[in-house]
């Protein structure tokens, strides 16, 4: 809703009144527009450039396009009442409820239960599919419970933080549905086996949740959608032509571990394309987040309700979105080509206890499932060569080379996909052709003596007499008011950032800011402004592969056409010479103190059928009632060449303002404007407004949904507010050339809306039960000293309000620090003792450190009770490490140029003992750090009392999530 509309319209009204005052003082000739002639002689014109048609039609067009965009964005298409062939929605919903009964992170006993349940469901679906088909022509189904694979790798290329080494043991489940055209041999049984023929398709969904969320959308819906894909593609009539691999991976939440482990499975050499289904919200529509190329994106376009824009991919590429999904591994490590489809809002429920089945719907399930079915069906049915062949990437799959693409949906029902090179080509063409076309039009107008724009005067060729054209009037009004209104809009963004920065968290649409500008020269200024933006966009398209500037191409195209129409209108005007002659004759017949009481000569009369629109008739100017100042010889006035100076003076003087010929709406415009086409404005408006509303409206809503709650994670709120302010101006910009024709009703209404929303935004509390502020929990214990600190990390000042409600902080010192937490503060206090291990602190971890004889290597042996996740942290980075029994992959380096500062150890076995050999750097004089184990299972009450206490006593507007992999961290310090 508008925040700055009232301010903008006020500035517009001031400018308009000042301009009108100037016109009256200078006695500018009034305009007589064709619509006035039509209105007075032929009746009402419903599309004339007059206040009511402009107000009504413009408002209807905006409402007609904006309302459906908002509805589509927020309402999920309903699921069918009867399940389509090959799927069972009731079964899917029941599976989701079962899957999300408990938190099930990798480091929890419930994760093992989910693993076993998935195996049973997969076997049951496979068995029922065989029984259902009743024939032997169905595809072969192979189920792999991967409890053998392990891998050592590092965080290089995953996050821009300190280098972290990882050892992980797989608990992945894979299902291979053999395609009709696949190799019929079980090639994976051979150690050196290689698939033959065309590559297959991978569908991936991770089945672990975070320790503080039930994982309904992250990633329960993805898991049960993948189960339904198994049912669908083993149903007669839907058998795949190319092989389909369904990967249920474990450990995604902790470091994309399951996807990395898949690299060691033989089937990773078979899949050339992929679909990753994920969740970063808690319901709504599933969004196409990313795609590797144009060719694979076209298969997503087959879905019934596509939803997404290339803006998301560019945000990942530019680093605005810092979180990662398994897409990163499949694309970056394997070189597969595919798609990333995920839920994205509301972020306030993401990774919290509200990510449950209660807060999603069967409609959301169907939206993701239907997209997965159509996309996968297209991929497994494709038999071309687009995804096969050498691509020049050594060490990666030979799956052909794709082209960068551009994509966006239209109202969630159709999908546009084309190559970035196509966008670049059109951008260059528009940059060249549009200015040349306008220049050619201007040259033609000058040649025909009809270029009224940019001209203040014209001079009669036969006498040198000067007549005012007022062609420069309003030239600088557009940039002036654009600058003022934009500054006010952005100023309000800074005001909100200062006074109530998190109001967008619960009220994202209360901060949207429309603007209004005047029409004079507006399209010409818009043309120049959009041309500059298109130049910048074209450079980024070519040099950085940024495709989300596609809206600028369409925007500029529409503005170019509208601007050209404005120039084409000038061809309907008389030449400036004819206009000047007529003005002098009319002026000579107008009473003034220095009028000559002479009649015009014959050669001074305008030609018959002149461009002025009708033959000249002296009676045309004798429509006023005689007064005491009326000349007695009014019809006999004439001007000689000697009197052109006085004629020129009077051309700026008193002119008849008979209301029947000069309605009040146009009385102050240039007289020559009577020949402009009154209804041309509607063409200009329709060329610009609809496409801008659709493209920028969808982009604006997408951007708002993706970012309005990132402030809880330490993201900059100012960037969001300024972004919304800029989008507001761009979306309302098509109204600027016409806004002066609006009646006062809409500006007045929006002024009141401005006042109301501004007061609300400055005073309302930004959080609520449905839009909770996320704060992150961790409990850190020094197992040697027994020091026990519970901590919450969140944005200030609200984190202090939350901490004060916790009973165990009463009368105790609470320490808060803000450095190193990305715009958030960490508040710590003496916490309640956890019961994750039924033993004294010193017995929670068993470890041994032995120094090698060369003084360059050290062996660590570490094990923790009731856990399968431990760490070794070093105060100074080490050069290298090796976990006994592990493998490495040259595609995935396990160390980096600056060494490793942390080693994370994950085992599928509880209370496992890891043996880690560490190589120190030459500079490692300070060989000290910590051995640590973590506990993440919070399904049993009273296991982590400090967390239970926070959940019980924190305000209803606060939500608890995890800070790191473990909810409880126990550590011993070491120094060598």
Swiss-Prot record:
It is found in: Vacuole membrane. Residues 618-627 have a biased composition (Acidic residues). GO terms for molecular function: metal ion binding; metalloexopeptidase activity. Its EC number is 3.4.-.-. Residues 73-399, 449-477, 541-550, 697-718, 767-976 are vacuolar. Binds 2 Zn(2+) ions per subunit. The chain crosses the membrane at residues 52-72, 400-420, 428-448, 478-498, 520-540, 551-571, 676-696, 719-739, 746-766. InterPro entries: Fxna-like_M28_dom, M28_fam, Peptidase_M28, PFF1_C, PFF1_TM. May be involved in vacuolar sorting and osmoregulation. Belongs to the peptidase M28 family. This is Vacuolar membrane protease. It comes from Arthroderma otae (strain ATCC MYA-4605 / CBS 113480).
